[in-house]
């Protein structure tokens, strides 16, 4: 009997196989899930032995909005044959930040409107923990007056450039009356001596807003008396928003000047009975 031998070498050099996991998209870097070997579900090998799946690394492309992270897993069979599969994780925030519109403001004059202030936007927030930038955009007037409405706009922008606009309504409406003093009184001997109305006698008109003030004659009203008669002369003082006051000037008509006449020529008569009767026509 003769024995012969055959050497059979078992040496698996075929790498295992597996599919790359599906791409994941998240809003924020904090939303990137932890590595999980269970996302590899179809690992296989030509030999029926245990296959080990392991996390290898996360590598970012260094970009932002979006940032792409390549996550690598190794697939190792019982003979140490290794395959690598990768999963793309895209970090891209497309969610708008939030902020509230500012409360309305009211001003008497356009000069009282406060300057823009980004610090008035106090509740800005975002789904991702990055810097939020608040900026003044512009003031737009409705072109009205008394009131005029100004819409002030601020932008709120997150780190990925997602932006919203918030507004503040500013109403400019002057409801404060102008001021002026009553002109000094006048005295006249006769009604015909009363001077004509003159708006320039009102000299100290003023208003809280720097716009033209109009003074106008309103009326002369007599008390109906005589010797003296009192006339109340009224002027109106009106600002640019139609706020109006009335000022008055008292004019007293009182004639205190004696009349004049010449003595009649002398008359000579011979007898007392010849003295003529009184005659006012002389």
In which residue ranges do the predicted regions lie?
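Proline-threonine-serine-rich low-complexity tracts
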Residues: 1-282
